[in-house]
Amino acid sequence: MNRLPSRAWAKAAPCPALALAALGLLGAQPCQAVTFGSEHGISGSVDSTLSYGFASRLQSPDCHLLGNDNGGCNTATHNELGRYYNLERGNGYANADINYSNADDGNLNYHKHDVFSQVLKGTHELSLRFGEGWSALGRVAWARDFKMDDTRRTDLEGPARRDATQRFDLLDLWLAKSFDLGDMPAKVKVGNQVISWGAELFVSGGINQINALSLPKYHTPGTQLKEVFIPAPMASFSLGLTDALNLEGYYQFKWNGYDVDPVGTYFSSADIAGEGRRAIYYPTGFVEGLQPGTCAGSPTGRCGDPLTSGLSHEQLVASGLAVPYGGERKPGNGGQYGLALRWMAESINTEFGLFYQRYHDKLPFIGYTARSNPDALVVDDYFINYGEDKDLFGVSMSTLVGPVAVAGELSFRPHDSVAIDPTVAFGQGLTGSYNRYSVFDTGVSKGFVEQRKWQADVNATYTFSGNDPLGFIPNALGASDGFLLAEVAVTRYPGLDTSGRVPYVLPDYSLPDRTSWGYVTEFGLNYPNLFGSGVTVTPQLDFSHDVKGTTPNAMPFVEGRRSLTASLLFNHRDRWKGGLQWVRYWGGGDNNLMADRDFVSGNISYSF
């Protein structure tokens, strides 16, 4: 009876739906570098930023997002997928309690008003210039969190504790050469680097996906934008074919994936993805629905994890009440590359871009093996899996419409990975009919199917003051200027089977939609030299709304999901910076695993 759910929504590893651009405001960007060298020799600069930050929970866990053994009140078998796969029809079993029971450690570990992060961190950068057009950059970051492992229910496992409390990361490390190729300016860069293509600002899933992200860093108070993107070992080039036409390309030497939140930490939304991952434990309601009376033999009369059942991990696995972790199957290091062609149409002051990328998935899926006894619904183990050899085609544009910077992009993925739960469907041993989506028939499931995906994005950036159309706002509120950013995106999976036959994965086992869309806005005002202090104060609001439709993998949209962040940012001559943030999540029903994770945070940093 070793069945387990897919955890592919852990792909989302949700983080606040705020502008990554805003991180540049929240964190300190060092401007007071120590410079050295001469014009004709080696010259360079050393930049460092030290920061301290904290974050505290503002609400108690919501029972709809917890396993029912842990005080939850989730939907269990009352779900859309269960209308197709259910015990009464004898063709499958979709009980969402197994999803929430294996996704709530981070939620249960911190109570309302708990300080879940108290972090001291630093970023250090060395930039060099030498010779004829040579340059180099090295950047490292470290962090020490004093509160993340102060948990209420489940101790952080060794790898999770190390990742959550002590980090040292090598970020950029590259060497570049600028030169002329005939009459064409060129540049080649080799080493750990970040490449940003496309036009998106806030919404993920478009063209800008060359580099993986570090979600733990995103969730760390005081994070700088350049720390969030994980540099990848690549060789890249740019070549100015004409004054208006530019060619760019890259080849990635080694694959790296998303860094997801360690299991049991505050923003972790999957107990089997990330450092500290553990076995999948079957909750009482799930087991009793299949085999009544099974859990009565445990010390507590319940199934679930060791704390709930009173049985050890080994006992649970041996009795078929848990499924062990079977390892990570990483993609190959080769086969990732891309080309970009940019054309500046000067007559209309608009840049157009064409893009192609060959890539491997950077976000994890959950695969399964079921070879020992599939007719008894035995799953041998689960493994972390990634799709390989994917293609992305994209176009973009950027221009000015009056004082407003407008940009947009359209991307197409002919074989996007869409998560399924192949343990929901019973195999032919029980149904008499072969089901290609059932791991009990295939023996091994990679945990996803492939679908065509389109995503379109349009965004605008507007800064205003005094006599501008929106200048009355800063004038009325005593500010010098303001800024407004807005983005709308839509995702389309034209071939998605919404009948329920394909067991797509969402936390509550509802079915995803072919079309989904949403928007994000950011608004702020600047008050320079407030009260003659030399401090620029910036109040800022960020709001996101997933308006209609839920995307497969719950990324980027979950219908009805919203978030709001109110920030108050301080900048004293680009040396001292700080901020206070209040973050609220709501909407999206039981698919919004962040709906009860409201928090407040603050940080202060010093750059030198």
Spans of features found by a protein language model:
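Residue-level signature of outer-membrane beta-barrel architecture
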Residues: 124, 128-130, 177-179, 239-241, ...
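Transmembrane beta-strands of outer-membrane beta-barrel pores
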Residues: 52-58, 142-146, 192-196, 251-257, ...
